[in-house]
Every structure is written in structure tokens, then in C-alpha cells.
């Protein structure tokens, strides 16, 4: 797919990188692996009716690092036609050697989910940076990272698995910790994240 004109007209490159070789901007998420990461239906909907995923400005912003985070500005909205062309283009952007089919979409059992919740909240402290839901559906957690509520509609499971295992592969500088996760633990946390949704 050729790069759509809307990417230039809407100033997408002011906030996003479309290639690993471009300078890291720290304003919005990188898009050079969007095809590995994002689901098409969600992407089309987001581009036409943007919602807030990260409540504060990108975590490498200097104001964030000294304790004065700024709220994110609303994302620009595209027409349906623009969104379709842009999403088709973005989904062609992939890393050449990212292993797929690491995670199936079979949900965790009740017992496995309880164990994964302990890993997510206590062992690895993911809740310190990410919005999630408690047992009665109330929002809780930090805001320095993107919200994980309903993230299964947005993200592909294999990408989440690889992000948990090797975040530096996607972002050389950032606040995401590098954990020494075995595959089973990474899969379990990925599935737990995909179960954080407002309509179980």
C-alpha cells in the first residue's frame, strides 16, 4: 500500500514514527510495527472517533519525568474514507522477524486468572502504571502507561507477548521495565490483560 495523503495532511509524522530509522519523537506511539500490534476494526473506529488511551503525555516528556505531567491533547479525527486508507497502510507496517502464534485466544480458567492477577498486580507491579478494573468493575491503577481496559479489542495477543518479553525491541527508550519472563508467564499475563474488559 502507498502511504495515504491523509498522513501528511493531518500531520501524523509530527507525533508518530513510521520507521525505526526516524528520530524518536516521544509524543505518540511508534507505528512502524502497527500491523503486528493493532486490530483493524479498532483502528478504523479510533481514527474516526478517537478516545483517550494514555491519560498523560508520553512518558519520556521532560515535564512528566519531573512530576508535572500534562494531559494528552485530543487525537485528530479522520473521515471514514481517510481512516480506511490509513488503517490499510498502517497494517502493512510490521517487524520482519516477529514470531507469531505464540498466544492462542483461549481465556484463562478462574484459578489461572487469579494467579495471573497476582503476577500482574503484586509480582510485577503493572497496575502502578496502567489502568485496569477491580473485581466490581471500578477503574483503578496508574496513568503513566496506556490503559489496559478493553485492550483485547485494540491489541493483538502475539504483540503483547513480545512486548512483555522484549520491550526494547520496539522502543529503545521508555519507562516499560524489562522483566525476565519465561514464556508461560508472559502468555499468562497476556491472557490476563485480554480479560480486562467492561463487558466480560
Q: Could you describe each region identified by the protein language model?
A:
Residues 134-135, 140-200:
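Structured core of small recognition/catalytic domains
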Residues 1-19, 107-134:
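Sequence/structural segment immediately N-terminal to covalent heme-attachment motifs in c-type
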Residues 37, 97-100, 104-106, 147:
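General marker for long, soluble alpha-helical cores
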Residues 13, 17-46, 60-62, 131-162:
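Gly/Gly-Pro-rich "capping" loops immediately C-terminal to redox-active cysteine motifs
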Residues 68-101, 177-200:
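C-terminal capping alpha-helices of c-type cytochrome domains
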Residues 1-5, 17, 26-30, 60-77:
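Sequence context of c-type cytochrome heme-c attachment sites
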Residues 17-20, 36, 48-52, 91-95, ...:
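Sec-exported extracytoplasmic/periplasmic mature domains
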Amino acid at each position: 500500500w502507498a502511504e495515504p495523503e491523509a498522513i501528511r495532511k493531518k500531520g501524523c509524522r509530527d507525533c508518530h514514527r513510521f520507521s525505526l530509522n526516524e528520530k524518536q519523537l516521544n509524543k505518540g506511539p511508534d507505528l512502524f510495527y502497527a500491523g503486528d500490534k493493532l486490530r483493524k476494526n479498532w483502528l478504523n473506529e479510533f481514527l474516526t472517533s478517537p478516545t483517550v488511551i494514555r491519560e498523560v503525555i508520553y512518558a519520556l516528556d521532560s515535564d512528566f519525568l519531573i512530576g508535572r505531567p500534562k494531559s494528552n491533547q485530543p487525537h485528530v479525527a479522520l473521515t471514514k474514507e481517510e481512516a480506511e486508507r490509513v488503517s490499510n497502510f498502517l497494517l502493512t507496517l510490521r517487524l520482519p522477524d516477529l514470531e507469531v502464534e505464540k498466544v492462542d485466544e483461549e481465556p484463562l480458567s478462574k484459578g489461572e486468572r487469579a494467579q495471573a492477577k497476582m503476577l500482574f498486580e503484586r509480582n510485577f507491579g503493572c497496575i502502578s502504571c496502567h489502568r485496569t478494573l477491580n473485581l466490581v468493575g471500578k477503574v483503578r491503577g496508574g496513568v503513566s502507561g496506556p490503559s489496559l481496559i478493553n485492550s483485547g479489542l485494540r491489541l493483538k495477543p502475539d504483540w503483547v507477548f513480545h512486548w512483555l518479553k522484549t520491550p526494547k525491541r520496539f522502543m529503545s527508550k521508555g519507562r516499560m521495565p524489562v522483566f525476565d519472563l519465561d514464556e508461560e508467564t508472559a502468555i499468562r499475563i497476556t491472557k490476563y490483560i485480554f480479560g480486562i474488559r467492561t463487558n466480560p
